[in-house]
Design a protein with these regions (language model features):
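Positively charged, glycine-rich low-complexity segments
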Residues: 1-132, 138-147
């Protein structure tokens, strides 16, 4: 097992909090203190698409456009959006592997069973001194509410 079982699902305080989280995920914050030459190794997935979006292959300006578009699309839903950062506590692993990917899929299925649906998944591989981790943006869909 690679990841902690104790995954805390957090609620956004407001739209600004949501925007800050997206900046962290997309590495588009103004300070750029986490962006480095390894940032293109990060991966970004949307909903049920198993293919990397390639957003981290883009330069900062283009990533900001993508992030802002995503924010514009989702910022009115912040009242039912949540987020989680899932850590790998093992200090001997810094690169993702296929087994971690499978475990991540299992975690995502478990969240869906609890009515939290992944909208965006970002794997950060650009912090070699930090543990492997991934971020999930989740949309909670209450099963008791008729749409």
């Amino acid at each position: 097992m690679y990841f902690n079982n104790d995954i805390k699902i957090n609620k956004f305080i407001n739209r600004s909090d949501f925007n800050n989280y997206l900046n962290c995920m997309f590495r588009t914050d103004s300070s750029q203190n986490l962006t480095n030459d390894l940032t293109p190794k990060n991966k970004c997935y949307t909903m049920d698409n198993p293919e990397d979006t390639g957003v981290f292959q883009l330069d900062l300006k283009a990533r900001k456009v993508v992030k802002n578009g995503f924010f514009d699309q989702w910022n009115h839903d912040v009242d039912h959006l949540f987020f989680a950062r899932v850590e790998c506590p093992r200090d001997d692993i810094f690169e993702w592997n296929e087994y971690m990917h499978k475990e991540m899929q299992s975690i995502l299925r478990d969240m869906q069973n609890r009515h939290y649906y992944p909208v965006l998944i970002v794997i950060h591989n650009d912090q070699p001194k930090d543990s492997c981790h991934f971020h999930i943006l989740l949309d909670y869909i209450d099963p008791d509410v008729n749409l």
